[in-house]
From Swiss-Prot:
PTM notes: One or more lysine residues are methylated.
Source organism of this protein record: Thiobacillus denitrificans (strain ATCC 25259 / T1)
Designated name of the protein: Large ribosomal subunit protein uL11
InterPro entries: Ribosomal_uL11 (IPR000911), Ribosomal_uL11_bac-typ (IPR006519), Ribosomal_uL11_C (IPR020783), Ribosomal_uL11_C_sf (IPR036769), Ribosomal_uL11_CS (IPR020785), Ribosomal_uL11_N (IPR020784), Ribosomal_uL11_N_sf (IPR036796)
HAMAP family: Ribosomal_uL11 (MF_00736)
Domain of life according to the entry: Bacteria
GO CC terms in record: cytosolic large ribosomal subunit
Keyword list, A-Z: Methylation, Ribonucleoprotein, Ribosomal protein, RNA-binding, rRNA-binding
Length: 143
């Protein structure tokens, strides 16, 4: 018989830097899950990734206090800022432009994000990422 699911916990945790402090500790503690077990497993899985890169994770909590977790790809905004070496997007995206991104950079980001995107093909994925870049006040070239 399958385990009974008591809930889902969605967090963004920096790669390789999971520790019991907030937000992880309180979120897992409320469900009675072993916080250190999650931290060790998450840090082991993110060992090869760039340290500090925020990784969205969905934790499934079961009635017997066990859990599983699924890691997603980093947010598109983080990948875009990293690609064009930007600290933050524009506070007025349609007026103040803060940078420029090329189609090649967008394709690279779309390949990284492909497992999480619902786009039918690579061109649609690139257009999705381009829309995100535009909403951050970044000029998109070649799309």
């Amino acid at each position: 018989m399958a385990k009974k699911i008591v809930g889902y916990i969605k967090l963004q945790v920096p790669a390789g830097k999971a520790n019991p402090s907030p937000p992880i500790g309180p979120a897992l503690g409320q469900r009675g899950l072993n916080i250190m077990e999650f931290c060790k497993a998450f840090n082991a899985k993110t060992q090869g990734m760039e340290p500090g890169l925020p990784i969205p994770v969905v934790i499934t909590a079961f009635a017997d206090k066990s859990f599983t977790f699924i890691m997603k790809t980093p947010p598109a905004t983080v990948l875009i800022k990293k690609a064009i070496k930007l600290d933050k997007g524009s506070s007025k995206p349609h007026t103040d432009k803060v940078g420029t991104i090329t189609r090649a950079q967008l394709e690279e980001i779309a390949k990284t994000k492909e497992p999480d995107l619902t786009a039918a093909d690579m061109d649609a994925a690139v257009r999705t990422i381009a829309g995100t870049a535009r909403s951050m006040g970044i000029v998109v070239e070649g799309v």
